[in-house]
Amino acid sequence: MIKQLQHQAKMEFGTGDIGFNAGAIKEDDNKVGIIIFYNQEPRSIGDTGDIKEGTEVDINDFPVVMKFYRKESIDVVIKALLEAKKEMD
């Protein structure tokens, strides 16, 4: 569930109630990688979310948007996620 708190947006994963989609947008003639996150009804983790792949959306309609201006930034986030996963063992 995505919770909008006073000073942060908190994303709590584990029940399949956060949907997300990835893609790219154009900004000032540059491609920017994006991931949008949204609340949805719980479902099996990994099942298709409410927004089907290829659907055009306005990223301003979502409570959390990650924007990547460099591919290296995506690598850093992946590394952090893998470390968090490892620490859960």
Region spans (language model):
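Positively charged, low-complexity terminal tracts
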Residues: 1-89
